[in-house]
Amino acid sequence: MNAPLSPKARDAYRLWQLCFGDTDAFLSSYFSEVYRDDCTLIGYTEGEATTHLQYLPVELSSAGERLRVSYVVAVCTHPDYAGRGLMKEELKTALILSQERGDVASLLLPAEDWLFDYYTKAVGYAPIPVAVTTTSLEAVLSESDPECEGVTLVEYLTAVERASKAPQLLHTPAIWRVVTEDYPTSEGYVLREHRTAEDKVNGALFYVEREDEVIVQAVYGSSAVREVLLQEPSHSAKKVSYYLRPEGGRGVGEERRGMIRLLDPLRFLQHLATLHPDLRGAWAYSDELFPALDGLYIVEGGVVRRTAYPTSHAYPKCRTTAELFAQLGKSLGEELSYSLRLFFEAV
């Protein structure tokens, strides 16, 4: 039996359901497994809960290197109070609290296209590739995962993500439990497991069947396991689309984008320098929300250091995450990207 919700959680639950229409079954699972009062912001207007967001503590992983980050979910304003500019201050507060918690960056998936511009202008988020949509089955089969097994589906999914060297946002076991419980309960949403002869899970498939299209949102497993799992959707008479991780899907389909906002550029750059020892550069970085981060960031020989903000114009000026990412993309020869899927986003 679920523990009673706190007054704050009850307000969060009601506002989430009012704005997004999610079922009691999903919300009960989410609020039991994932929700935390200390990761939730609710704004009140004359005693009425009017704004809501949650900034979940998760990890960003690349080649086994991990960074603490926040993932922002369920950003919403009560319909009767929309258009009053209430959310901007809540987003700023979430970023400040995330930084105080030790998060290196904040990520989110805008629910609608117009929100990309809003999040950029409001608090400095930058768009990044999080997936590529393709119709190429060959491309999906070439994107294999490490060999992993789990007694349960959640155990397998947690293990295979952490074994992968792909740049990605990692699910916690609690988030995986909510995702795997809820996914097959929605109309047209299908979840399949692949098991070994010893009845261990070693693959999983998530896809959505629509009236005129099948969308494979995620598939996990070796190439051989993927081939077995994908037989069902690939034989459909409908158009079949597949989501690939962005770094492996370049040039084979249409990019899907999420957003990222740096909170600690020094630690983020050190993360990149560890992964890319040949990365070199110096950038004059400034941050309107976090002026203490202003400075000249120098990367060389796998080491990052920060000095005082330069008075000369000899260095590229980066006033936002987007501008710094553009400079890093030039230095690395490719755009930075992180796989982000099955985090409660709409398909």
Q: Language model features by range: what are they?
A:
Residues Y118-K121, Y125:
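Conserved active-site tyrosine of GNAT-family acetyltransferases
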Residues L67-P79, D212-S223:
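Conserved acetyl-CoA binding element of GNAT-fold acetyltransferases
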Residues V72-T77, G83-S98, S223-S234:
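Conserved acetyl-CoA-binding loop-helix of GNAT-fold acetyltransferases
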Residues L41, L56-E59, V73, E112-W114, ...:
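Core nucleotidyl-transferase/polymerase catalytic module
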Residues M1-P57, G64-Y71, E138-I175, R210-V214:
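Short amphipathic alpha-helix that is part of the acyltransferase structural core
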Residues G253-V347:
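C-terminal functional modules
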Residues A126-P233, R245-R250, L262-A284:
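Amide-forming acyltransferase catalytic core, primarily the GNAT-like/NAT-type
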Residues L91, S98-A111, S236-P246:
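Conserved GNAT acetyl-CoA-binding A-motif
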